[in-house]
Amino acid sequence: MRIARFNGGRIGIVVGDMLHDVTAVAGVDPAEWPPVGMVRVIARFTQLKDALVAAARSAPALSLADVRLETPVAWPNKIIAYPTDYRDHAAEMSASTHADVQGYFLKASSSLCGPSDAIELPDIPGREIHHECEIALVIGKQGRHIAAARAFDHVFGYACLLDITIRGKEERVMRKSFDTFTPVGPWIATADEIPDPADIKMRLWVNAEKRQEASTRDLIVNIPHMIEIASSASTLYPGDLIATGTPAGVGPLRAGDTVTIEVDNVGRMTLPVITAKAVANPVFGSPYEFKRATT
């Protein structure tokens, strides 16, 4: 099943290039604040699944071209992200430590945006702002101290995720938490849609140039161990997002670009890149030159 959030917080089931509105059956109020409708659906999915399937069969079909797709989980309890979790990316960044010893960091939930939004680049002279192609794990069941052997019991589904990053030496959380710096979408593919989570292929293009391509088989810390590590410190809740890390090929974005990310058996989304309103930021006052390691 592919579950989308659209048109101001409504819930839909995607079948092919059509969407079926199941908001009423899901028990979601699109006007609710905070916007936790999808979190409620995820938490109650076992009870709701049959009714959602039936509603999708009877609900009028809307063309995906005629709706505004939004980030699937607008108000997660947290966004967990793993740094340098692919060896080729660690090499290009000259990183001496990897996700297996660094653990995770957090991104601000306010950095989320969806497939119908634009990535807004702050105007920071002397800095590059890079794309990072990733997969989002969507947690479906609360848990703490989850053993790797049981980790997939807690995975609700998967989505495409872009981790937009200002290059520099400042605190990673701030460099990755500007508004629109975490596009997620275009929907959630439930776990049963993924034949082999150990070999999920993803790729990214900027304009027509393919810049990144990898599989989860190349991860340093695999998906079960990501969940084990994260839950050793923090309780995981339905709707929490875990970003799996980026492979090699990161590079700069500029206003006017388009970024396309595709994850097999999940989906594909394309976002435009624009310049955000200029605001002085003293933290990024010094230039930083990004140098890719050579081999």
Question: Can you say where each PLM-predicted feature lies in the sequence?
Answer:
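Catalytic-pocket segment enriched in acidic/His residues
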Residues: 7, 46-53, 60-62, 67-68, ...
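Residue-level recognition of short, solvent-exposed, well-ordered loop/turn junctions
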Residues: 74, 81, 114, 130, ...
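Structural signature of FAD isoalloxazine-binding scaffolds in flavoprotein oxidoreductases
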Residues: 97-115, 131, 260-265
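Active-site glycine-rich loop that binds ribose-phosphate moieties when present
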Residues: 104, 112-125, 138-146
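N-terminal accessory regions of nucleic-acid-interacting proteins
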Residues: 144-158
